[in-house]
Design a protein with these regions (language model features):
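Hydrophobic structural segments
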Residues: 1-271, 276-296
């Protein structure tokens, strides 16, 4: 009989808790370790839609990257908060919840290593190792590697296509792409370190205004590919690892969990013009020249 404790032990073997940031909340956040597990649902987030899916499937355990309890001082488990309502639902249906968050970001074969592989980087390595694991492998947050030198536009298309993004936010640092750093999720604060490491391009998500400005001043191509799209590629891989480790357990990758963020633009390119705005007026600025040419 496979138990929650068995699943937890395995997950912590590939993403040890000591790799997690001190402020993080990882591991078993809901449920009993002794509970038998016959069916697992894997998803990036423990959102309501994922919990409802787990109930419909009859899952015993949800395994996610992001923690259900995070960044809040939870003083009561009741219906006053969404976290409380989710916890109550899980407990009422006997569903346990495990997450591997920043420990999975840091771990060999984790979030950022998979992101680097997904973008077809070569010579992938930990940019600034935090330590070595029991097998002597470096671990740490940021990964770096190389691609054949190419124009930024080509690499943007690669990122958008390979990660399945609806759109990208980016700053053109004025250099072709060759040496690339990646950090899934909210790693925009590492742009200065990326520059010091000699990277001309940094792919991450949740980038702030001042981080884009810093990248521009440092001459780094900074690409925001979205939190979901930079982290979710690891989750089906984790699901497959669980299937191999526990062949007697049914492991299902969530079909309902999707990125809820969408891009909206009020501009609609028709032919060579932005409707209602003469191209002569727009052509004074490089960005709008691109709009007028239709190669945005």
């Amino acid at each position: 009989m496979t138990t929650v404790a068995d699943i937890l032990k395995y997950i912590e073997s590939i993403a040890p808790p000591y790799m997690a940031e001190s402020w993080d909340n990882v591991g078993l956040l809901c449920g009993r370790k002794t509970k038998a597990v016959k069916k697992i649902l894997v998803a990036l987030d423990p959102f309501r839609s994922v919990i409802d899916e787990a109930i419909a499937l009859g899952a015993d355990l949800i395994v996610t990257h992001h923690p259900l309890i995070f960044g809040e001082e939870l003083k009561a488990v009741n219906e006053d908060t969404e976290t409380g309502r989710c916890l109550l639902t899980l407990m009422e249906h006997g569903i346990a919840a495990i997450n591997a968050h920043t420990n999975l970001d840091m771990a060999p074969g984790g979030i950022n290593e998979v992101l680097a592989q997904k973008l077809a980087l070569v010579n992938i390595r930990v940019a600034d190792p935090s330590g070595t694991d029991a097998e002597g492998r470096d671990w740490g947050l940021i990964r770096m590697g190389e691609v054949p030198e190419q124009p930024l536009e080509n690499f943007l298309n690669r990122v958008k296509t390979l990660l399945g993004c609806e759109g990208l936010r980016y700053v053109n640092g004025g250099k072709p792409v060759k040496n690339v750093c990646v950090g899934g999720g909210s790693c925009g604060g590492f742009v200065s370190e990326a520059a010091k490491l000699g990277c001309d391009t940094f792919v991450t998500a949740d980038v702030k205004y001042n981080q884009f400005r810093t990248a521009y001043e440092l001459g780094v191509n900074l690409i925001d590919a979205g939190h979901f799209h930079t982290e979710n590629p690891t989750m089906p891989i984790l699901a497959e690892k669980l299937r191999r480790e526990f062949p007697g357990v049914e492991v299902i990758f969530s079909e309902n969990h999707r990125d809820v963020m969408r891009f909206y633009s009020s501009f609609q390119i028709v032919g060579n013009a932005v409707p209602g705005i003469p191209c002569g007026r727009l052509s004074k600025k490089p960005y709008f020249r691109k709009l007028c040419r239709g190669d945005h």
